[in-house]
Amino acid sequence: LDMDNDYGLIKQSVIKADGALKTAVDEKSGIRILNQDFFETLISFIVSQNKSIPQIKQCVKNISHRFGDEVIGYNGEAFYVFPDVQRLHDATEEELRECKVGFRAPYIKNATEAVYSGAVTKEKLDELDIAQARELLMTIKGVGEKVANCVLLFGLGRREAFPVDVWMKRIMEQMYFDGKDTKKQDIEAFAVNKFGDLGGYAQQYLFDYARTTLF
């Protein structure tokens, strides 16, 4: 739950970076960026492409149920944890397709092989600067800049990462570019310059606030 970070200080720093975010920060003050497992985050964001949130959740649940271990919760209810690299590496592409991941099945296989072989690991990524880490992640089939930035932010603790999807592009254009169509790369560069190491936090406040308020 990212309890080691002082969110009071983080919120003050985000507002200091841009006073226009005060309302967003105040209204969405409970937002936290969770410290999530790298491998699960990688696969989940590969699955997320062109899917709705309910569909993504169902696919991840299907993968966990098919390949993960059963765990009994405190109330006696059974659930399944996300499988480790070995378990998913042993899965066939056809078995993955049965989890309703569609065209993403070969991407999941490629990502799993990259992690299993040691070509792309959390340890390697942690040693690189953010640009190098993004480039290494994008050697995995199906991982573009947006997915790579999401993995950096949510699965590797790189809080300076600023993922830009269709929604975030629209939000940033309206708030900072007078509504003009702007390239995602230019938006990301602007965010890096404006928010620095706070980029991921600013992105989360902006994303949640704007989706429920501006549109």
PLM features: residue spans?
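HhH-family (HhH-GPD) DNA N-glycosylase catalytic core used in base-excision repair
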Residues: 1-215
